[in-house]
Each structure stands twice: as C-alpha cells, then as structure tokens.
Amino acid sequence: MGKPHPLKPGDTISLVSPASFLTPEQTEGGIKYLTSLGYRVKTYPSTYRADGYLAGTDAERADDLTAAFHDPETQAVLCARGGYGSSRLVPHLDFDSLAKTEKLFIGFSDITILHAYLNQRGLPTLYGPMAFTFGYEREQWVYESFADVISGRSTIPTAAPKGDAVHPGVAEGIVVGGCLCLICDLLGTPGQIDMTGKIVLI
C-alpha cells in the first residue's frame, strides 16, 4: 500500500460528515479556510444534513464517505466533525476498497474508529483538524500547522506549542491511537489497534 500524496493548490478536498452534523455557518467557515489555501472543496449531502445528532442515517453517511474516497477528482477526504456515529458506519463500509484509493484521510475524536480500520489495511491517515476546527477562530499555529502538514512542507506540527516531557528522549516509529474512549471501544473487535512496537497517541 502506498502513502497519500501531499496536496498542492488546485487539488480537491471532499468534505464529509461520518458522525455528527455541522451548522451551515460552521461548514462555510471550514470551506472558506480551505479555499483560502488554494484547494477546491467538494461537498456531499451529509455535509449539510442533520438527522437528530447525526449528519443523516448510517447508510447515507457511509455512502457519502465511500463516494468521496472513490471520486477520481478527490485527493483528500476531510471529516466535518467528530461527535458520535462513526462506529455505526463500520458494517456499511468496505475498508479494503477505501484504503486502496490511497486518499489522504483527515479527522480526529470520533473519527478514531475509521482511522483504525484504514490503518489496519496499510493506509496512513492524518489525525488532525476538521472543518469544525476552522469554523471558529483559532490560534494561528493551528492554521499554519495544518497547512504545512497536508502540503508536505512538514511531517509534524512545528508551529504547535511545545509540551513538557516526563522522560525526555527521542523515539521513532509508527504512530497509532486517537481518542481514548474509542480506542477502548475497539478492544475485542476486528478494529482493535495493534500497539506492539508502536508509538501510541492518546
């Protein structure tokens, strides 16, 4: 399995909602930021749909996610937000076919579930900001780091504030993990994350 290619101006980012919905104002804020970077943005019905707490039925959200991955004009698939609902898509998705597209997949929080299944199939993904993130004003480093990483200018968010290390040192390896409650939900399932020899992000 190959790695997703860095994005370049003019590339298309498909905006999908596998979990909870966004308000139109939040969605437009995310689209405005992405287009300011020079990217085209493609939306799907679930991008603007609301069905209770979710962005449509499980089948509708899964169909949109599948369509985005298999769209030949799309280079990256960006989740609108997390919240709840991604785990309900698992029975509706063919992760083998999604991973083979080698599209850049981006999201965090509830999207942990989808990362886990795609990573199992050899597709590296980006645990990072979503459209929801850019629907509000954020610190400048959030915008800079996101733009640098998706374009391949940096593999780490160099502009982010530095934390304090409990045990300083250097580690190299494959990073896995995500939202702790979702990591726990995956235990004992086919999507359980293999952490052997990995760097675990929580």
Residues of each region from the PLM?
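ATP/NTP phosphate-donor binding region
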Residues: M1-E73
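Structural motif
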Residues: I13-S14, R40, Q75-A76, L104, ...
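N-terminal glycine-rich "phosphate-gripper" loop used for MgATP/nucleotide binding
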Residues: A76-S87, H92, F108
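Short, acidic/small-residue loops that bind anionic groups at enzyme active sites
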Residues: F95-L118, P124-M130
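Conserved anion/nucleotide-ligand pocket segment
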Residues: P124-G188
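Active-site beta-loop-alpha substructure in enzyme catalytic cores
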Residues: L180-I202
